[in-house]
């Protein structure tokens, strides 16, 4: 076990990921079925393209695939429930028996309910289940839940975000929200925390959270790193969105060294390559 002070395992729907036996983080592959995602908008909007990408990630060894039908990039407009369902449900239905865990990236309770009916294993919510009905949607479902910190909403979150102390403020929110979700009947073993890189944070805020990522891992829950291809990497490297692999891998290893338990990425094979080297050197 490379991360200390965690629950024994992560209960994620049909799957039980035993932290006691793991020597590397889980890899969560991103599958956006949206036309306007900041990174791959439109590439996987068709069913066939999405399924091919999912198969590529599965062949690469992905632990869980995160399927999203609405972009939450800065300034993104909300989409109607019917459109989101049309985008994600056929993909979940086609892939649910392939032996890999699946997550639904949504904040809409009805989307959660419909995805869970089809057997999705995890709900990944940028609103941390704060929308009315979201807690009820996952109550007693036995699914994993990812609780993310976001200041304001996707439309306004990058308009001059401010904190007294970004690390302390995000830590406090995550700790309090996790306990509130537990009080609703979700067990600690189902919960993953996400500090929300790029969601209501300036470049300085993001860099501080990366430098002090270990402070989130001290909260007693597994912590997810979601930094793949994000604008902070472009601001530092000067690279366009599809050229940010190298800084993304560097950030990943920084966070893993501090206890990241899940790495959410667009670049599954390359992330695995980096983690294999990290693991080999660590267990030598």
Residue ranges and their predicted role:
Residues 4-14, 22, 39-53, 72-94, ...:
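Active-site-adjacent loop and "lid" segments of alpha/beta metabolic enzymes
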Residues 52-68, 258-259:
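Catalytic domains of carbohydrate-active enzymes, especially glycoside hydrolases
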Residues 187-190:
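Short acidic capping loops at alpha-helix termini that bridge into adjacent secondary structure
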């Amino acid at each position: 076990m490379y991360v200390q002070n965690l629950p024994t395992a992560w209960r994620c729907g049909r799957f039980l990921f035993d932290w006691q036996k793991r020597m590397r983080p889980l890899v969560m592959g991103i599958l956006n079925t949206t036309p306007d995602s900041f990174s791959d908008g439109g590439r996987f909007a068709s069913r066939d393209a999405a399924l091919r990408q999912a198969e590529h990630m599965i062949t690469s060894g992905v632990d869980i695939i995160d399927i999203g039908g609405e972009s939450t990039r800065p300034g993104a407009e909300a989409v109607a429930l019917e459109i989101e369902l049309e985008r994600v449900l056929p993909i979940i239905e086609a892939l649910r028996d392939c032996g890999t865990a699946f997550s639904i990236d949504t904040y809409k309770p009805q989307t959660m309910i419909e995805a869970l009916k089809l057997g999705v294993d995890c709900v990944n919510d940028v609103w941390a289940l704060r929308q009315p009905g979201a807690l009820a949607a996952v109550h007693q479902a036995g699914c994993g839940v990812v609780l993310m910190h976001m200041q304001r909403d996707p439309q306004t979150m990058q308009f001059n975000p401010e904190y007294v102390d970004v690390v302390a403020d995000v830590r406090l929110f995550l700790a309090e929200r996790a306990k509130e979700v537990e009080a609703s009947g979700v067990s600690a073993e189902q919960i993953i925390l996400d500090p929300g890189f790029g969601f209501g944070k300036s470049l300085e805020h993001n860099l501080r959270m990366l430098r002090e990522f270990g402070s989130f891992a001290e909260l007693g829950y597994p912590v997810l790193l979601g930094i793949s291809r994000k604008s902070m990497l472009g601001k530092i490297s000067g690279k366009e969105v599809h050229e940010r692999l190298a800084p993304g891998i560097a950030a990943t290893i920084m966070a893993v060294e501090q206890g990241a338990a899940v790495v959410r990425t667009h670049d599954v094979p390359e992330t695995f390559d980096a983690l294999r080297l990290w693991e080999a050197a660590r267990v030598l």
